[in-house]
Amino acid sequence: MQRVLSLDPAGTDMMIALGLESWLVGVTHQCDLPEGIELPRVTRCSIDRSMDSRQIDDHVRQQQSSGTPVVLHDSEAIAALRPDLILVQDLCSACGIIPQHLRLVLESHPQVESMALAPRDWSEILESIDRLGHCLEQPKQAESLVRRLEERRQRLVDNSMQRPKRRSVGLEWLEPLYGIGHWTIELLKNVGLIEQLGEAGEKSHPIDWNRLMEVDPDCLLVACCGLDANRAQEEFQRISKPGQWLKLRAVEMGKILFLDGNRGFSRPGPFLIDRLEEIDRWLTSDSPQRVAMAPEATRQKLSNR
């Protein structure tokens, strides 16, 4: 058994899905662990939780321009955990620890191996799981997990063939407006949601308000990076001006879904399928349970109309 330190929430999710959570010796402040498991958290975030969307965006840009990471790690705590392997993401320096941030730690402890995870689509997510399983000498567990995830995804595709496709726009941030990218667009297509303002595999991108109005999607999905569904809904209500958002057909008709952008689509890991299954149930169910709905003025469930 190896001592694994995960500095990537998606990597932590992979360890848990592989049944190897007992191998973990430490995680980030962002990681979610199974009930009853407590581990040292070796990172912290410089973002004040009281900041609104605009303030958070300004802070992140300021930190990046000065070369200061938004997420900070505790080098002494990492060394004290004596990891054999460190998992780290290599997609976004604004969201977490990247390999460059660990240069001094790894140089000081050359016996420690590191694995950078940077999947940009569903196939690369599965490849990352397989690679991690082989690295930890648990290839059969990884192969089994990959097979089960693919079977679940295919069932969603089959389900979606029984209903009309919907034109959708996904938002990763609200102020300023940013559209979804990477793996999310591809996965949403599996449940019949066709993104109108982004391309699968591409990075998240700024969205022009006029362009959003022009597209006028059938439904709107809000999954703000790092924010849960309730916080995303609060931000939506805060920045919504009378008549502005309501010009969108999706909002006017209540065809809007707030998603957990922290535990959900911001993590390229195995639990993306769970989130996708929740959306599939929401698209086909008459019950509003487990759904964070739109503001009071537009509070209606998304129907099949």
Which residue ranges define each predicted feature?
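N-terminal ligand-binding lobe of clamshell/alpha-beta domains
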Residues: 1-305
